[in-house]
């Protein structure tokens, strides 16, 4: 048989490469003493705890700063709300004063829509020529008959004096209100400035305290990191010294082949103590290799003999197939010759039959009149 070089399976190649990588990783973990770690890394856990504490302290300082800012904003908002409430109160007071002074009940001129006869009922019955409810349109007072002019003039002067005094009072009250408002605004601005200065000082002190705390934390962390590095360097030096001492005092540098034997599995060896094979082991391996070589040679000869048999059998089969093909061609040619003669005879018989039909049987040909006698009615 012939050997055919087939391409390797990608899945099998990937699996082999994965096993090789896993074996290399295991060897790097097992045989490298410096990188091999047994148990829990307490130092790393402590570092994580310290980092967590530092992060929490930083977050608390940030929250304190945010709280200070929030208090400041709340105070400013309260002051603004108080100022807005004061403005609203002053405006309401002015509106109320205007209503009390300008919109008195006795001076209103509105008409009561619910009582349309109110104006007529306000006028009493006829009292005389000097009745105050009747004017010039009522024909009660004619030209040259103004008997109460002095009274009217006095009342007019009193009205003017009252209006002037009221205007003076309003102007004075407006000036007083304006002065009070200005004084309150000045006091409010002064209080807001003082509060803003206090909050700025408080914020500056918080910032300085935060910076000092951050600097102290960074300094402590740097000192701790330096101590950890020094301890790590010292541990590494001690590990190197221990390794050198172990190499000197152990059986690794000896030439004793018994050191490499595994006490648990005698058929295995310890890789880090193995110094090579003994002459007996090498002789055994050579003997096994020679035996395998002889077996391989015998197998190769057997395969060659089997291949020769297969080749001879293939030649015989090819020759037999060739003979069968020749016989098949001869039979096909004979069959075609017989079929041709049979077809020729059949054609002659059919021609004779057709001539018989045309000359003897089908002598009376139908005319058009014969075909017209059919299908002449609907039934």
Curated annotation (Swiss-Prot):
Picking any one GO biological process from the record gives: flagellated sperm motility
Tell me where it mainly resides. cytoplasm
Q: Where in the cell is it found?
A: Cytoplasm, Cytoskeleton, Flagellum axoneme
UniProt cross-references to InterPro entries, sorted A to Z: RIB43A
Q: What does the UniProt keyword field contain?
A: Cell projection, Cilium, Coiled coil, Cytoplasm, Cytoskeleton, Flagellum
Coiled-coil ranges per UniProt: 43-111, 285-337
Cellular component terms (Gene Ontology): axonemal A tubule inner sheath; sperm flagellum
Q: Which domain of life is it from?
A: Eukaryota
Q: How does it assemble?
A: Microtubule inner protein component of sperm flagellar doublet microtubules.
Name the family. Answer: Belongs to the RIB43A family.
Show the PANTHER family listed in the entry.
Answer: RIB43A-LIKE WITH COILED-COILS PROTEIN 1, RIB43A-RELATED
Any idea what this protein is called?
RIB43A-like with coiled-coils protein 1
Please report the organism this UniProt entry assigns to the protein.
Bos taurus (Bovine)
Gene name per UniProt: RIBC1
